[in-house]
Amino acid sequence: EDGVLSEAEITWLTRRAKDGFGVITTAASHVSEHGKGWSGEMGVWDDSHIPGLTKMATQLRENDSISLVQIFHGGMKAPSELNDRIPVCPSEMKDNEGKIVARELELSEINDLINDFTNAALRVEKAGFDGIEIHGAHSYLISQFLGVKTNRRNDQYGGSIENRFRFLKDIIISIREVVSKNFLIS
């Protein structure tokens, strides 16, 4: 529940490497304490996650696998029951009865989230992984920025496709500026 990697997850992925998988990508790992999409999910939002990540990266490398950690934020799909707060989204979202189910992100929060993705990538690199996969599908936060129904913003992060893409672009640029040249970003 605290995002620390379990022995079962390490064993499961290491077994894939021992079986000859050349590239191993972890399950989605939340970059923010309040971005968890489901119970028991792996986290990369705190330095306390680095020891477990290091153990996994070492075991995968010892079995000749390239290793990536998939990073994401659940956005409006981060249940309030798990995160103790109303979910966030590029724009406010309401259910059919008009109840707010996700609140709109402030610009300062968007910048904080870009930093969360960047810091998560740094933790992944410090742990010894070969790279990250930025999860931008399945209606999670990045996908919500790209969508016209979930992103009705009137600022630099909304409107045109170029603006809706800006959140992901800013994440990639920010990460690339701080990780090593050979660190993979997919």
What residues fall within each predicted segment?
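N-terminal capping/small domains of soluble enzymes
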Residues: 1-72, 113, 121
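Structural preference for beta-strand elements that scaffold enzyme active sites
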Residues: 23, 66-70, 131-133, 182-186
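Active-site-proximal loop/turn and secondary-structure-junction residues that shape catalytic pockets
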Residues: 30, 73-75, 136-138
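Aromatic- and acidic-residue-enriched carbohydrate-binding clefts of CAZyme catalytic domains
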Residues: 31, 44, 79-105, 145-165
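Alpha-helical scaffolding segments of alpha/beta enzyme cores, especially the outer helices
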Residues: 55-58, 119, 170-177
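Non-globular sequence segments
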Residues: 58, 66, 72-129
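Generic beta-strand/beta-sheet core signal
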Residues: 70, 135-137, 143
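Active-site neighborhood of glycoside hydrolase catalytic domains
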Residues: 158-185
